[in-house]
Structure formats: C-alpha cells, structure tokens
C-alpha cells in the first residue's frame, strides 16, 4: 500500500454539520505541555513535534477534544507545512464516535477562515483514505510530492 497526499476543497464543506457530545477547543499555551504529553504517550514523538509547531504560534492551529476535563483527541493544521492538515489522533476508547471527523472539520474550518481555499492531507495510507473522503470529501492528488520526504531520517 502506498501513501498519497489528499486534497480537500474547503469551499465545498459544511462546517455546521458536526454535532458530538465532546468539547473541541483550540489549544491555549498553558495547556501545551499536557497536549504534547498526551500525544507522546498515545501516538508518537514525531506527532508530538508536529503539534508543538502548531501550538507555539500567536494563533495556535491545534485543537483538542475534551471529555470531563480529559484530552481524548487532537488535530492540527499548518504544522509541518502551510495548508497541510495533520496529525490527527483519537484515544482508543473514544474512536468510532465521530470525534475524529469533528476534529478534522474544526481544522478545515480553521484553514478556511485563515484564508485557504484548499487543504492538503499529507501522506495518507490507502486504508485511511476512506475515512478522510467520508469526513471531508478528500481526494487523492495524483503523483503528489511528499512533504515528509524532507525528514532527516528518510
């Protein structure tokens, strides 16, 4: 299976369609260490690094899903590259509840109101592409060049 970049037409999305019983918040700097710790514990250090890039801005581009004052998911945009969405993660116990889609849409809304017309979701596995198509109508970019090829360990 190969990874593809995906394209999202932000003009074609309905940002009011998300209704879940979980709160989604834009990360504030006093919470950034908690978010980085959560991501490192549940996902990966590289995702935690990407989230740091999204949080340490005047206008943070990282959102968290919160249930009973506990972080249960996160998503970022403009972290690794401008106009790119990701990473996205939801705690195992909270999957299949629409939280991932809600986080995707919150970031897509952020991208739209930050002036973007389109978003790119980088390096998506074939297995995960259906999730993004269902969440935000993301389609593969044929022959896309991968931003992650610039990683030091590649």
Task: Explain the meaning of each model-derived region.
Residues 104, 125-128, 148-150:
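Short glycine/proline-centered loop/turn elements that form peptide/ligand docking sites
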Residues 22-35:
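A short beta-loop-alpha structural element at the N-terminal edge
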Residues 133-143:
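Conserved acetyl-CoA-binding loop of GNAT-fold acetyltransferases
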Residues 33, 80-84, 127-130:
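Flexible loop/turn segments at secondary-structure boundaries
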Residues 40-92:
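A conserved beta-strand-loop-helix scaffold within acyl/acetyltransferase catalytic domains
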Residues 111-124:
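Conserved GNAT acetyl-CoA-binding A-motif
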Residues 90, 96-109, 134:
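Conserved acetyl-CoA-binding loop-helix of GNAT-fold acetyltransferases
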Residues 1-19, 145-148:
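Acyl-donor-binding surface of acyltransferase catalytic domains
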């Amino acid at each position: 299976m190969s990874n593809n970049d995906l394209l999202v037409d932000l003009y074609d999305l309905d940002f009011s369609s998300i209704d879940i019983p979980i709160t989604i918040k834009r990360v504030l700097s006093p919470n950034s260490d908690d978010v980085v710790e959560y991501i490192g514990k549940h996902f990966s250090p590289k995702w935690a690094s990407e989230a740091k890039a999204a949080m340490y801005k005047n206008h943070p581009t990282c959102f968290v899903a919160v249930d009973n004052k506990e972080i249960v998911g996160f998503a970022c945009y403009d972290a690794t590259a401008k106009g790119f969405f990701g990473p996205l993660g939801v705690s195992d116990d909270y999957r299949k509840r629409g939280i991932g889609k809600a986080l995707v849409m919150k970031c897509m809304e952020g991208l739209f109101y930050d002036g973007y017309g389109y978003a790119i979701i980088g390096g998506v596995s074939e297995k995960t592409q259906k999730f993004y198509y269902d969440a935000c109508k993301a389609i593969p970019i044929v022959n896309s060049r991968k931003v992650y090829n610039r990683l030091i360990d590649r």
